[in-house]
Amino acid sequence: MSDSLQDEAGDPSKDADSYWQNLLGFPIDPWLGISDSALKECYVALGVVSERWNRSEKLMRFFTAHYAGIPEPIAPLVMRHLNNLSVTDLLSDCSDFIENDSADFREAIEFLCKLFSRCRENRNTLVHSSLVLNIPKRSADRIIKPSSPRAAEAKTFACTVDDIKRIADDIQHLNGVFVNLAYALECRKDPTKFWNPSRTPADFLRLCKFHLPDKLTLLAPE
């Protein structure tokens, strides 16, 4: 088709945008959905969830390998063959063995495993679901997780941008637990390494105690 004929035919993508803008009554952003809406904020929050979760997975593998005493040169070779569930089970089993006489450390590591699993569940629900648009509000208030080999029916969860931000913050708290547990272990091994000699492992373990975050709310089928 010649350039002149293309010009006469117009740009199909622009025609489509014009159609939907006239139908909906507000402008369409072709990349992020609805202009000037909370939907953009949802996408930003999802990006934060992904970035923080990537860090959590790295911390989990590093922490578990170090705690289990896997030599540093071969630790990456071992850990890359384990999925998140296997790594969590390995850390829990090592804790049961190593902390046989240290109930406080065993409790803290078990909490870490539970927190990691809860954040993993919420993150997986988010990233494997689709945002459901609330057109009048120009936002999203639900997500739908499609059917899969493990679930015959799609599942709908209540989920606003605040829920996504909360999950991102939960993952950030998880990453803080990794750091505080590492400090507690180092303090137990050599208290002189810290600038404040009065610090004890219990001071760091105390920072690892809080309520598990909630799961996303599953809505009843309509």
What annotation goes with each model-predicted range?
Residues S2-E51, K58-E222:
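Acidic, Ser/Thr/Gly/Pro-rich intrinsically disordered interaction regions
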